[in-house]
A protein has these predicted regions:
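P-loop NTPase nucleotide-binding module
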Residues: 155-156
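P-loop/Walker A NTP-binding region and its immediately flanking N-terminal helices
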Residues: 1-151, 161-166, 173-181
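Short, surface-exposed helix-loop/turn micro-motifs enriched in polar/charged residues
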Residues: 133, 167, 175, 208-212, ...
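Ser/Thr-Pro-rich, acidic low-complexity intrinsically disordered regions of eukaryotic RNA-binding
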Residues: 82-86, 197, 301-302
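Amphipathic alpha-helical protein-protein interaction segments
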Residues: 23, 76-82, 130, 134-137, ...
Length: 321
């Protein structure tokens, strides 16, 4: 209801900060809001790469998803150069009437979109569009450096008349107060097990897959209330089914887990079984292997703690946490 009221009054739309756990549906709600404000044209998306140049003449390339009315990106992918990316993108959007005129793609088309696509989106959006601004969707804002967040705060003030920012993060405490105070915070809570199971049932019904209620609940629990992960688990169950009827899943169907989760479980078992210099070196090698395969350190440590806790005495659990 809150998002619906914001979409019904596009002229009064403030900067927004969506926060909540992974897989709770933050991005889905953002896209729903954009569609309500700008119409179907906001869902015609294209993926492109944009090149930025830092004051030290270093070139930074960022993947961007765009429509004629908004642009979505994760500035944190630029590392320590994230503040230059934020400043350049918002400044360029504010100076262009249409996002289709921003930058230049590698194929020489002169923008993110072909002109025919831009015209079609404008014609369809005229009936719906009431806003005279563009929207910048910044993902993983809590991973930005302090310098980038300070630059974001200054840019928000300077171009507030022509741009609206929608920020998405998992942990709002890592976003500086000046940025949070300039945004309307919208908390997106993780769905309950029953809600995840209901979504899985809906998806399976649309895909003509028979999903037992027991398996839906098991997937919801195994996903830890992460809806994105639950959908991937459902897909894995369907793909790995070897029966003659792959469209029919059984209640006792095994739920596949990712290789890195199995690897961390092996690491936890090794740590709990033996504490010695040899075991320490083996654990370090496994940690390096996970990091080399681009598993975030925060995810590794959190998963490792959850695997270790059931294997430890109650007197030690507090120290581990």
């Amino acid at each position: 209801q809150r998002l619906t009221s914001l979409g019904d009054d596009p002229g009064g739309l403030p900067h927004l900060l969506f926060y909540g756990p992974p897989g709770a549906g933050k991005k889905t709600r953002v896209m729903t809001l954009l569609r309500q404000v700008f119409g179907p044209g906001a869902e015609r998306l294209r993926l492109d790469k944009k090149t930025f140049q830092t004051p030290t003449k270093r070139t930074v390339e960022i993947n961007m998803i765009s429509s004629n009315y908004h642009i979505e990106m994760a500035p944190g992918d630029a590392g320590l150069n994230d503040r230059f990316v934020i400043q350049d993108v918002i400044k360029e959007m504010a100076s262009n009437k249409n996002i289709a005129n921003m930058g230049s793609s590698k194929d020489g088309s002169g923008g993110f979109f072909a002109s025919s696509s831009a015209k079609n989106d404008e014609n369809e959006g005229n009936k719906k569009q009431k806003a005279e601004y563009k929207v910048v969707v910044l993902c993983e804002v809590d991973k930005l450096t302090r310098q980038a967040q300070a630059a974001l705060r200054r840019t928000m003030e300077k171009y507030s008349s022509s741009c609206r920012l929608i920020l998405i993060c998992n942990n709002p405490s890592k976003v500086i107060d000046p940025v949070r105070s300039r945004c309307l915070g919208i908390r997106v809570a993780a769905p309950s097990h029953d809600e995840v199971a209901a979504v899985l049932k809906t998806v399976s019904r649309k895909e003509n897959i028979t999903l037992p209620d027991e398996l839906a609940i098991n997937i919801a629990r195994a996903s830890n209330r992460n809806l994105r992960r639950a959908l991937l688990m459902l897909e894995s169950c369907h793909v790995t089914t070897r029966d003659d009827s792959p469209k029919v899943l059984k209640a006792n169907t095994a739920i596949p887990h990712t290789d890195w989760e199995k690897y961390i479980a092996m690491l936890a078992a090794g740590i709990a079984s033996e504490q010695s210099p040899k075991a320490l070196m083996a654990a370090r090698e496994k940690l390096y292997e996970l990091l080399i395969n681009c598993i975030p350190a925060q995810v590794i440590l959190k998963t490792l703690v959850m695997e270790l806790l059931p294997k430890l005495d109650d007197t030690v659990k507090g120290q581990v946490v």
